[in-house]
Amino acid sequence: MTELKNDRYLRALLKQPVDYTPVWMMRQAGRYLPEYKATRAEAGDFMSLCKNAELASEVTLQPLRRFPLDAAILFSDILTIPDAMGLGLYFETGEGPKFERPITCKADVDKIGLPDPEGELQYVMNAVRQIRKDLKGEVPLIGFSGSPWTLATYMVEGGSSKAFTKIKKMMYAEPATLHLLLDKLADSVIEYLNAQIKAGAQSVMVFDTWGGVLTPRDYNEFSLRYMHKIVDGLIRENEGRRVPVTLFTKNGGMWLESIAATGCDAVGLDWTINIADAKARIGDKVALQGNMDPSILYAQPERIRQEVGTILEGFGDAGTGHVFNLGHGIHLDVPPENAGVFVDAVHDLSKPYHK
């Protein structure tokens, strides 16, 4: 494999010295870029874009042509696993993802099998291989999956949800059924991420988008427990390097110590927590990723630079152990030039902290 020209992202995750703070953006390949919209139109629809390795690679690389980002992230969707389990994923315009056959009872859970990462999900692995080839060693490639809990919310609710009543009903009325589903999902995520690593992903991330809707006790039992299982099951060395794993629970600031105790290399932070507090709590154990509110990218350039400076100051002089990111995905109507201001500000303003 080609030697990495810029490995700052991997080094920062492993708390090795870097000369500036590396940065990437959640959803950096996406609808805020006109070139993405053009490629998506060429593909026909979102899943066709995901399933075409050349086009998935093209959109993965688009933000890297505009901005000096320190990592690329696989262009895919967290719902590939439930789709491959036969739930019938489709997208309603303006409404997000839906499933034709949601999970309603134990019989539904019993019916689903573990998808083969080089079978039903081979299109994802083909995209990973294509992206690695097209990156030519410029920056590392991040693979990812949704967390078992987050995948289960979509599978039981039948799509997005505001109140999560269906999955919470299952959690409280039929906990054994939900545990059965989560266990299958954890096994599937382990196979899926390990296949991404074998195909060329140099780091992996688990997105627990909806862990923050749970009580502390339920979070430990129904979300974190299964992410811990995933961390234990992952390949951690490949191509002669450690493969870092990042866990990100949105609205998970209450549980940072528990997340850090899973054995992950890094913990993702959303914008609802002060990074200085997070560092004081878990910075001795793990690297931190985050955590600017994506809405700040609507502001004037000076305000964006100011916010970047505040977060860098909050993390302080550690010299490493921080990957700068947004606290969640970039919004689809952010001007691309503002994203450029953000990336440049991280590089410029972080250098004094790495002397």
Swiss-Prot record:
Enzyme class: lyase
Binding site for substrate: 27-31, 77, 154, 209, 328
Record keywords, A-Z: Cytoplasm, Decarboxylase, Lyase, Porphyrin biosynthesis
Function summary: Catalyzes the decarboxylation of four acetate groups of uroporphyrinogen-III to yield coproporphyrinogen-III.
Subcellular compartments: Cytoplasm
Gene responsible for this protein: hemE
CDD domains assigned to the protein according to its UniProt record, in alphabetical order: URO-D (cd00717)
Assembly behavior: Homodimer.
Alphabetized Pfam families for the sequence: URO-D
Any Gene Ontology CC annotation: cytosol
Main subcellular localisation: cytoplasm
EC number(s) per entry: 4.1.1.37
UniProt-recorded name of the protein: Uroporphyrinogen decarboxylase
Reactions that this protein is recorded to catalyse: uroporphyrinogen III + 4 H(+) = coproporphyrinogen III + 4 CO2
Gene Ontology MF annotations: uroporphyrinogen decarboxylase activity
PROSITE patterns recorded: UROD_1, UROD_2
